[in-house]
Amino acid sequence: MAQFYSAKRRVTTRQIITVKVNDLDSFGQGVARHNGKALFIPGLLPEESAEVIITEDKKQFARARVSRRLNDSPERETPRCPHFGVCGGCQQQHVGIDLQQRSKSAALARLMKHEVNDIIAGASWGYRRRARLSLNCPPDKPLQMGFRKAGSSDIVNVEQCPVLAPQLEALLPRIRACLASLHGTRHLGHVELVQAGSGTLMILRHTAPLSAADKEKLERFSHSEGLSLFLAPFSEILETVSGEAPWYDSHGLRLTFSPRDFIQVNEAVNQQMVARALEWLDVRAEDRVLDLFCGMGNFTLPLATRAASVVGVEGVQALVEKGRENAIRNGLHNVTFFHENLEEDVTKQPWAKNGFDKVLLDPARAGATGVMRHIIKLKPIRIVYVSCNPATLARDSEALVNAGYEVTRLAMLDMFPHTGHLESMVLFERM
């Protein structure tokens, strides 16, 4: 009878070695050298020495954990959050913000083989205008409300979260008390909080119908806190209990959105990012501009305030409809939105028949492989690529460089301080 064994990590004997860290990777791990290869050590900073235990040993690199830190870097910070190290939300609160930004910029520069010209950043605390907190109410135990543990599905009960917008953080204990008082706590899935330009939103996901008494209690809570409340009994259904359609500002334009629509988490960085895209593209009154993966028009509509015409292409129908509504609401009549799958053959899609002078694209983590060939065929003068995944950015950039484009500006977007997320934007110009 055949037997199957799960692959095991190659681990050395648990000997303690002393190392000195000389670098920090973009995820906030200290990097040392041992036996001629990189040794990654969470929790250590450059110029710190420590006794460590190797936990994983591979051909190209190894990992270790700290047994005893021997000195502290001047760039080490005391984490503000009492849940840091347990909650999986933040990985770098022990790292000074300047070092965080330098390490992310260095990683981006290495990957793109180009210096980082700009760091676009806002406040490093209180920046998150959106959060999703998991809910669980085990039998005979208090309601759990918080974020997932690092590497686990367990919930960390959070009483505070200093990266949340102050208005949202202040609500946490009162929301917990309200939800814990409901009769249907065992049917609660998660709660989403959004700080929109129009005020605070609360979206409550529940897996079974709420009683009339529970709904009434939630509505009273929403009125007393001055927030808009939405119930989500199923993934595709949203019931408005109180409040109106929310909106946020993008480069002076008011964009309404559905409470579940994607909006950038960091408002300050989003505003700077949109302004920088307009600057880099050097949009002029005669320009025809293409915005791919456009969402509800975060870039599209500001572009339309300057260009002769703008075309936005997006794969989610609801976002396309919202983009059209927002164009009308803002009096922009030179915008056309298309609902198309940009992972398919785009050459037969109606928007692809047009010519464009300049292109902006803001794809998801998978990147934009499906449209790169067509972008090159369009021969735009300038291309701005906004990325949430440096690996796919580097891959797609290679296609543009091979087609005669040159990277002329590279910016690191510090969209998520104290985390390992690395976002960026690049300007390509046709040579």
UniProtKB/Swiss-Prot annotation:
Q: Which SUPFAM superfamilies does this entry report, sorted A to Z?
A: Nucleic acid-binding proteins, S-adenosyl-L-methionine-dependent methyltransferases
Q: Which Pfam families match?
A: TRAM, tRNA_U5-meth_tr
Example of a GO biological process term: rRNA base methylation
Q: Which residues form the active site?
A: 388 (nucleophile)
Q: Which reaction does it catalyse?
A: uridine(1939) in 23S rRNA + S-adenosyl-L-methionine = 5-methyluridine(1939) in 23S rRNA + S-adenosyl-L-homocysteine + H(+)
Q: Summarize where [4Fe-4S] cluster binds, as residue positions.
A: 81, 87, 90, 161
Q: What is this protein's name? A: 23S rRNA (uracil(1939)-C(5))-methyltransferase RlmD
What's the gene? Answer: rlmD
